[in-house]
Amino acid sequence: MATILVGYDTETAAVGEALSLFTESPDFPSYRLALDPDTCRQALELLTEVHADVGVPATLFVCGRTFLHALDAVQAAHATGLFDVQQHTFTHTPFKDIVYTANDVTGTIAASPPAALLEELTFTSRLLREYLEVECVGLRTPFGYHRGLRDRPDLLEIVRAAGLRYVTSWGRNEENGNPTPWVQPFTYDEEGYGDILELPFQFWLDVVWFDTHGYDSGPALLDALKGAVDHIAREDLVYGACFHDWVAIASDERRVGWLRSFLRYALAQGVEVTTYTDYWRRTTGG
């Protein structure tokens, strides 16, 4: 059965380092929303309405800094039972060197050292345990990479050492852009980490789409997403969808409704919509 895993990178107030490289971008007014913790509160209220209305769950991949600065909002979203909460590091720290271009402005961020990665993962998992009573098992790596963590046993060792059981890190194509091809979930057996499941996030990230096509292109994104639903339904694929808290506000989801309509369309086509963690659990027996 075709399946969509819905995940929201919940990163408002944790991405200032990255966004500081794009102050000259014409999209910076939209990016500014990602600096204000109140954006996270607005977004989670909106996402709760959307998911309650459509009747499907999702995973929030939360940065630790976002979690602490919008704690009440994340707790309220989790309490609805609609959202599984996993992590997105503490400060949106990269596992690999990042080079990203948006509107002819290019930003470069170096990969974080191993000790920083491990401490960020460990600390964020502790926060989720302390404030939500959640045992964190999943990680969305910031940015996403072509081939995920393939051929990087050093990074997989950090993931394992932090007690994480699945990672969603393959989110770029060979040109470091989107759309990402429909590579399917796999375990890192070749690297010696068969206990770690990779759940790629394919097609278009919402932020990459809007950076490419403009933040007023929600209707066009909906058309593209419907095409993706048709494709996975026909080929019986797993689609790891990646959206962002602040992008729901920046793209005016409440008025445009591209996200709500996408979820409704998926259900209408007989596609299962679930969380990343649910898929990991039933695939691995975790």
Over which residues does each language-model region extend?
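A conserved mid-domain beta-alpha-beta active-site/ligand-binding segment of alpha/beta enzyme cores
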Residues: E191-G227
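C-terminal domain-boundary segment and adjacent tail
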Residues: Y166, G171, P219-G286
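Acidic (Asp/Glu)-rich catalytic clusters
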Residues: E45-G55, F67-T93, R129-L132, R160, ...
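Catalytic domains of cell-wall/extracellular-matrix polysaccharide-remodeling enzymes
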Residues: L68-H69, T108-E198, D252-G257
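Acidic-and-aromatic substrate-binding clefts and catalytic sites of carbohydrate-active enzymes
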Residues: D36-R41, F61-D72, T93-I98, P114-L117, ...
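Surface-exposed, active-site-proximal loop segments in enzymatic domains
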Residues: S20-F28, F95-S112, W209-H213
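Active-site beta->alpha N-cap acidic-glycine motif
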Residues: M1-D84, E135, R140-G144
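Hydrophobic faces of well-ordered beta-strands that scaffold small-molecule active sites
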Residues: I4-Y8, A58-L60, V85-H88, V137-L139, ...
